[in-house]
């Protein structure tokens, strides 16, 4: 990349008056490949020098035709850039080499060859940084114009992403270069940020920069062909009159000064003029030759992104002044303010920014800033990534290191101009000025935050001197986010955000956008973006139609599959039914045949026996019966009893006796169905329909998310349900990146691709200042999605959760983020209020234990020794009471734990009655459950109670060393903990209970001096925290426990006479309070408290050996005496039961 350096404008000795020459120097950077470009004094002459002195040199040719005999051109020893042979020999350039006449005069006047379709045309577009133009018909092909990123012939990149000014274009200098404008100012029509080139009104000239000679040697300058007063031609730059003109010289060793060019035409006026008006100015500063050059912006050139005046050089720049295109944005693409000619009689001053140029004299001057790298030289530029001001040598060293090679720099002059333009008050500008020497992070913001530096409105004075009356910045700057032209500024945003066409489409809220610069350019950019969005809507509509057709097709397929599956199973059941019926028939027939055969045999034997018996009876009754006849009767009877007629010895096994006494079959025939209805349950759950999450039926779990703490990770739980209202079996698929693109057949534009959803579930959190907060999604079981974010400021945040682009139930909603509680301040200040004293009257307490705050903000206290429950307002004023001593419903015997559920019902552990009672919010008895015993559902001194969001009741069964869970109606659900003396007690006399936000149950293990956490999914697994002691995180007889609105765990460390605070996520110790205030803090013990209860001095009612209780860990600043329970009100107040002092402390 080259830097054009005008040094001076003066008369040349010995030359006639009129033509003047501009001495130029070029500061050249070495590319990454190691090929350094030669400057004056280089030893590489030979071919390069003969090439510049050839007869086809444009300089030589031009001077012979127009200037006649003039001074010989200087000697040049190389070109600034090298053109690859593949580019010279490309198919689109080969036909043009035959017109070897220089300046492109041999090419037809009004035609060029399209690089895509190879057709000749007169109007085209320069979409890339090479010379290969594209006709408008090829360029406007949709959507290919959005997909092209590099030239198909040479690989050059797009002009929109180049590190070069959009008003100046360097093409490869070919013997016959392409026609069309090689320059364009901000009024040039653009299409998708590409230069729209057309045939110029006057003869164009291709040009390149080539250098040689010693620094300061004269160089030929091509001027515009203008008639002089003598009627001849004179050579001078456009905008420089015949009178003496000069440039103020600047040296890095001198003080910063304001550079100016006298009598130069104003910038910013007459936008309707030809876009070629600046060409003559650059032509006058350029040396024309036919040396092939290559754009520094091509992919083969990896020069750094930095201002031209910061290009690497062996030493401090030798030139006396530098003209660097001022950059209008933080992006690395420099932009040049354009000058349009005005009347030659106009005498104006054009201030040119110098590298160390300060603000105008009206602004407060800034002293030299020391380099933050070497700390020995004056700073020259500011690294946007390192956030450091560096000198020129440190900048060069920055570019030699691979890790910092691609860092972007901004000159301090431009940086200060931008900061001053942002400053609303002089004090703020002074602060910015001071921050540059130290840390400008606060002034600049983080790199990549989307802020765009706009140097066009440095100050009102400078705008008046530069512009032509326009008060708004020029629209030639580029958006640092989308690399698109800035077209407007938001009037509603706090910092007047600069917007490109893409930013306007993505800008949140209905803000008013004021166009900048040429309104035609702004409208054109918005039209281009609108056309892209229109095309996107059309493609999305086509996709919706495809999805609708897919839904209908998939529904039909699912119906057919359901019918087929059920028919298959029904057929199988029918076949089984037929088989079982056949088996029944077979068994029935067999059994019946056997029994019928046996019955027939028995009937035959019976007849035979009957006849034999009758014959024998008659013979026996007759007196004249001879012996022979009787013998025959005997044989007949014996034959009938023996059965078979066979003579085998064992043939009479089945004799008549056995036939008569035993039945050959039974009636056993029974159908056995599947056990426990397994098949029936499976049939009822047969199959499943997967349709994904439905926004209408999905919702946020609970409402605690509406209040969160600043600078603390906050988690929101979302319950996903399908279209039928059923829980999703898994939420993993809904939070994973989708594999189906929104446009299946077209590759979208880059910013449209970023706007596409990557999963079914999307969550957006907008902070009070309008910025987006990063949200992390984590899938859980049963369709639960955990959304976590980190609020950094206080205020009202907006939450919107989308399922497939549709807000879920209850969204969008607001969340109140506030500053977290400081427990160190609570410990230092002590209690803000104390109420209650020893006694049995209304508002008086006797050894209270449990406490809770209901949904109405009332404070409910279990007055244990008075066998009642008292209700107070938030300030401790007595409201009502209920309960008396006894064992009937509504009566108590030393009530202990107390809590409320979501229905605002009051749940009380009636300790010595070994039961739990439930009351409504007015104290009316509802139900009771439990009795003394060891079986499930029975208690042995229940102590603490807790309820969750489902109103399940957890009870600490102290003497049974377990915790039992019940339904809201008192039905037993499960237990945890050992209740046998033969096992080690993992819970030893549990006391306090509370449910954590994630559903886990937190228990104070009284005799083990620790905390236990049980998971609701597996009650047999338990985590324990803490041990016995008086250090932080250690306990002695812990009792009550509660969760505050910020998620902190508060534990009553009873015998240490304090309350300890822990983080719920990792049980990290945060602080403690409850001791007396620091001396001289202004706090005094409340006077209404009586002396310690003398009759009961031991802990928890044990016989006393002295008149006053003696704590286990005495403290000189003791305030609490064995705190037993605590509760947190909706306003954040902490109510602590001071057991030993028979009162309630409020913090």
Curated annotation (Swiss-Prot):
Region feature Disordered, mapped onto this chain: 1-93, 1104-1123
Phenotypic consequence of gene deletion: RNAi-mediated knockdown results in the precocious onset of tail tip retraction resulting in over-retracted and shortened adult male tails (also known as the Ore phenotype). RNAi-mediated knockdown results in increased expression of dmd-3.
Cytoplasm is among the record's keywords: yes
Binding site for Zn(2+): 371, 374, 394, 398
Cellular localisation: Cytoplasm; Cytoplasm, P-body
Biased composition (Low complexity): 33-47, 84-93
Source superkingdom: Eukaryota
Coiled-coil residues: 565-618
Bias kind Basic and acidic residues: ranges: 48-65
InterPro entries from the UniProt entry: 6-blade_b-propeller_TolB-like, Bbox_C, Filamin/ABP280_repeat-like, Filamin/ABP280_rpt, Ig-like_fold, Ig_E-set, NHL_repeat, TRIM-NHL_E3_ligases
One GO molecular-function entry: RNA binding
Zinc finger feature spans (RING-type): 114-155
Role description: Heterochronic protein which acts downstream of let-7 in temporal patterning. Plays a role in the developmental timing of postembryonic hypodermal seam cell division and fusion events and adult alae production. Represses lin-29 during late larval stages, which prevents terminal differentiation of hypodermal seam cells and promotes their division. Involved in post-transcriptional gene regulation, uses two independent pathways. Has direct and specific RNA-binding activity and, depending on the location (5'UTR or 3'UTR) of the target site, triggers either mRNA decay or repression of translation.
Family annotation (PANTHER family): E3 UBIQUITIN-PROTEIN LIGASE NHLRC1-RELATED, PROTEIN LIN-41
Protein name as it appears in the record: Protein lin-41
Species of provenance: Caenorhabditis elegans
């Amino acid at each position: 990349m080259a830097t054009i350096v005008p040094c001076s404008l003066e008369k040349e000795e010995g030359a006639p008056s009129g033509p003047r020459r501009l001495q130029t120097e070029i500061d050249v950077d070495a590319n990454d490949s190691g090929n350094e470009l030669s400057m004056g004094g280089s030893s590489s002459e030979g071919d390069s020098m003969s090439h510049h002195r050839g007869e086809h040199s444009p300089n030589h040719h031009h001077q012979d035709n127009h200037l006649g005999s003039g001074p010989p051109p200087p000697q040049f020893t190389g070109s600034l850039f090298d053109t690859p042979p593949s580019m010279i020999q490309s198919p689109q350039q080969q036909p043009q080499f035959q017109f070897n006449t220089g300046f492109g005069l041999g090419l037809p006047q009004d035609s060029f060859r399209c690089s895509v379709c190879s057709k000749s045309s007169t109007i085209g577009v320069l979409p890339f940084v090479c010379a290969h133009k594209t006709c408008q018909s090829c360029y406007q092909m949709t959507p290919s114009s959005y997909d092209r990123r590099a030239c198909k012939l040479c690989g050059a990149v797009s002009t929109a992403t180049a590190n070069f000014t959009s008003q100046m274009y360097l093409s490869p200098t070919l013997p016959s270069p392409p026609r069309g404008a090689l320059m364009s100012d901000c009024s040039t029509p653009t299409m998708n940020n590409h230069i729209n080139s057309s045939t110029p009104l006057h003869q164009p000239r291709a040009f390149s920069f080539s250098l040689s000679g010693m620094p300061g040697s004269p160089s030929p300058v091509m001027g515009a062909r203008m008639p002089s007063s003598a009627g001849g031609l004179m050579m001078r730059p456009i905008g420089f009159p015949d009178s003496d003109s000069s440039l103020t010289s600047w040296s890095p060793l001198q003080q910063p000064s304001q550079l100016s060019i006298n009598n130069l035409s104003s910038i910013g006026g007459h936008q309707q003029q030809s876009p070629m008006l600046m060409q003559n100015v650059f032509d006058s500063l350029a040396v024309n030759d036919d040396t092939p050059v290559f754009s520094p912006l091509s992919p083969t050139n990896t020069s750094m992104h930095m201002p031209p005046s910061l290009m690497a050089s062996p030493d401090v720049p030798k030139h006396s002044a530098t003209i660097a295109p001022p950059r209008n944005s933080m992006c690395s693409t420099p932009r040049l303010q354009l000058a349009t000619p005005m009347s030659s009689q106009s005498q104006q001053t054009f201030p040119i920014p110098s590298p160390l140029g300060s603000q105008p004299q009206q602004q407060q001057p800034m002293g030299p800033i020391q380099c933050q790298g070497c700390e020995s030289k004056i700073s020259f530029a500011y690294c946007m990534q390192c956030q450091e001001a560096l000198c020129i040598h440190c900048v060069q060293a920055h570019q030699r290191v691979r890790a910092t090679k691609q860092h972007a720099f901004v000159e301090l002059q431009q940086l200060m101009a931008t900061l001053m333009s942002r400053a609303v008050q002089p004090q703020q500008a002074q602060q910015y000025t001071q921050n540059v020497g130290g840390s400008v992070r606060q002034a600049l913001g983080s790199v990549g935050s989307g802020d765009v530096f706009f140097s066009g409105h440095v100050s009102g004075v400078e705008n008046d001197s530069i512009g032509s009356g326009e008060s708004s910045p020029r629209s030639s700057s580029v958006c640092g986010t989308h690399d698109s032209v800035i077209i407007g500024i938001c009037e509603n945003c706090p910092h007047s955000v600069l917007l490109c066409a893409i930013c306007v489409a993505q800008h949140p809220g209905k803000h008013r956008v004021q166009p900048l610069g040429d309104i035609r350019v702004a409208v054109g950019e918005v039209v281009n973006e609108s056309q892209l969005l229109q095309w996107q809507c059309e493609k999305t509509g086509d996709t919706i139609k495809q999805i609708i057709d897919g839904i209908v097709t998939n529904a039909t397929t699912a119906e057919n599959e359901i019918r087929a599956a059920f028919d298959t199973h029904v057929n199988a059941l029918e076949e089984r039914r037929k088989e079982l019926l056949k088996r029944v028939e077979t068994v029935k027939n067999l059994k019946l045949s056997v029994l019928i055969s046996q019955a027939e045999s028995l009937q035959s034997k019976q007849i035979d026996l009957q006849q034999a018996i009758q014959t024998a009876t008659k013979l026996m009754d007759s007196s004249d019966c001879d012996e022979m006849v009787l013998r025959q009767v005997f044989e007949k009877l014996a034959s009938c009893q023996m059965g078979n007629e066979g003579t085998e010895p064992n043939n009479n096994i089945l004799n008549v006796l056995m036939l008569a006494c035993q039945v050959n079959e039974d009636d056993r025939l029974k159908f056995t169905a599947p056990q426990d209805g397994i098949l029936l349950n499976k049939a009822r759950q047969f199959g499943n329909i997967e349709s994904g999450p439905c926004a209408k039926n999905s919702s946020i779990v609970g409402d605690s998310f509406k209040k969160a703490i600043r600078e603390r990770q906050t988690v929101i739980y979302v319950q996903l349900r399908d279209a039928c209202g059923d829980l999703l079996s898994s939420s993993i698929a809904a939070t994973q990146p989708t594999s189906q693109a929104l446009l299946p057949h077209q590759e979208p534009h880059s910013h449209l691709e970023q706007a596409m959803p990557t999963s079914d579930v999307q969550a957006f959190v907008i902070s009070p200042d309008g910025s987006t907060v990063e949200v992390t999604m984590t899938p859980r079981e049963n369709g639960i999605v955990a959304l976590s974010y980190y609020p950094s400021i206080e205020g009202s945040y907006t939450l919107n959760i989308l399922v497939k682009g549709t807000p879920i139930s209850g969204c969008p909603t607001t969340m109140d983020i506030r500053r977290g509680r400081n427990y160190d301040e609570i410990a230092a200040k002590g209690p803000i209020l104390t109420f209650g004293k020893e006694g049995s009257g209304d508002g008086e307490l006797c050894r209270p234990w449990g406490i809770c705050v209901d949904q109405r903000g009332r404070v409910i206290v279990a007055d244990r020794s008075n066998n009642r429950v008292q209700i107070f307002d938030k300030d401790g004023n007595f409201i009502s009471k209920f309960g008396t001593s006894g064992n009937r419903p509504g009566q108590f015997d030393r009530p202990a734990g107390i809590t409320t559920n979501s229905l605002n019902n009051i749940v009380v552990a009636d300790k010595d009655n070994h039961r739990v009672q439930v009351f409504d919010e007015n104290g009316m008895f509802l139900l009771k459950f439990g009795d003394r015993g060891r079986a499930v559902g029975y208690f042995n001194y229940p102590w603490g109670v807790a309820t969750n969001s489902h109103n399940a009741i957890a009870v600490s069964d102290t003497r049974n060393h377990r915790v039992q869970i019940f339904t809201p109606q008192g039905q037993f659900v499960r237990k945890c903990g050992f209740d046998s003396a033969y096992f080690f007690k993992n819970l030893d006399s549990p006391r306090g209970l509370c449910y954590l936000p994630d559903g886990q149950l937190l228990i104070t293990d009284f005799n083990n001096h620790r905390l236990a956490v049980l998971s609701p999914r597996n009650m047999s697994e338990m985590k324990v925290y803490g041990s016995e002691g008086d250090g932080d995180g250690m306990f002695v007889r812990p009792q009550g426990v509660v969760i505050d609105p910020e998620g902190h765990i508060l534990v009553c460390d009873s015998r240490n006479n304090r309350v300890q605070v822990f983080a719920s996520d990792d049980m990290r110790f945060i602080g403690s309070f409850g001791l007396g205030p620091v001396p001289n803090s202004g706090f005094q013990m409340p006077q209404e408290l009586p002396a310690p209860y003398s009759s009961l001095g031991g802990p928890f009612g044990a016989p006393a050996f002295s008149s006053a209780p003696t704590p286990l860990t005495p403290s000189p600043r003791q305030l609490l005496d064995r705190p037993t329970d605590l509760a947190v009100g909706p306003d954040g107040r902490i109510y602590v039961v001071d057991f030993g002092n028979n009162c309630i402390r409020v913090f």
